[in-house]
């Protein structure tokens, strides 16, 4: 629960930076030119993109099962491949690049243990995909509503220690 609250808080904070992707940004005396570098803007954009990944993954599964042509199994496997790609790439790199300064048996034993851990992480990622997508949608929608409509409670921040204490009560 602490992780989820922290993630929600961070996504809200990232989306409050949305105006900083434009050429004019809020200033103390009204709009002023944005002085952020292109790299800084790219980092903001990348955080926004990353906050929508679980939503996009879940939508891909749902649309593949309901609207896309062909067998739903094909779309499911494609979606699973996309979710598993980081783990698969890491495993393949570990298999083809063994260290030269260590013996292979302990190394590949560790790779095997990492494979089991990665499979467990992948399973949990899939089990919690809908929940994590909901957390992201809620955080994004709440922020956009507050920024565009109510203009209230934009700085609804809690420190990690406050979140942790609230959970343990």
Where are these regions (language model features)?
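Alpha-helical transmembrane segments and their membrane-interface junctions
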Residues: 130-140
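Non-transmembrane catalytic domains and loops of membrane-associated enzymes and transporters
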Residues: 1-122, 126-132, 146-161
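Juxtamembrane membrane-water interface segments that cap and precede transmembrane helices
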Residues: 163-166
